[in-house]
């Protein structure tokens, strides 16, 4: 008898409580198996009820999105025009997703949402996802972020070479918009534009160097003199002139 007790303890638990807990779990599993058909019916009813509730909420969300789209389109267009895209066409496509003639839920409701844009007169608007120009896409994202900055809850935004393919005048406008946006979000921007860099609250120099046959990157915070030197270098290249240094000082002074 004692040998059987030892075997039971080895198999089901070291204490009587462990063995009784195992019994209760096994009994519950058995009940589930015995009543599995009834349980499946009950779960199916709960699933259907939850789906219907979610569908009602998704339909309300669709209505709110549709109502907000016109205002979003107007404000994004205004921002892009400020960023020197005067012929821009921008709109949001919001379509209800269906399957077999019925509305179908997805992680964002019942909608399939896509933004379309044309930056040039006469060009057919394309999905933002298909835009090849990195600089153009960055400006579009800046415009979107500027419009929804107080609602999206994103605290940090990174822009990589948003100045690609733009003039100095446009770069300055981009910098002005980014500086304004920094009131609600932290912005990190990788740029080769003196106009944008001069508008930053904090300036870091990223530099690659050869260390014992390996390429290493360093990140150095710049003080005011360091910023003047770096802005002068961006403006003038290898040989920096006094006029370029003076221009760098003027850029910083204007934004301080």
Task: Map each language-model feature to its residues.
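Walker B catalytic acidic pair
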Residues: 160-161
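Loop/turn-to-beta-strand initiation segments
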Residues: 113, 153-155, 182-188
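Conserved D-loop-proximal element of ABC-family nucleotide-binding domains
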Residues: 152, 164-172
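C-terminal lobe/lid and adjacent interdomain/linker elements of RecA-like ASCE P-loop ATPase modules
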Residues: 169-256
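SMC-family hinge/dimerization module
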Residues: 67-137
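GG-anchored amphipathic helix commonly corresponding to the ABC/SMC/Rad50 NBD signature/C-loop
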Residues: 114-115, 119-121, 135-157
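Extended, charged alpha-helical coiled-coil/arm scaffolds that mediate oligomerization and mechanical coupling
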Residues: 1-83, 87
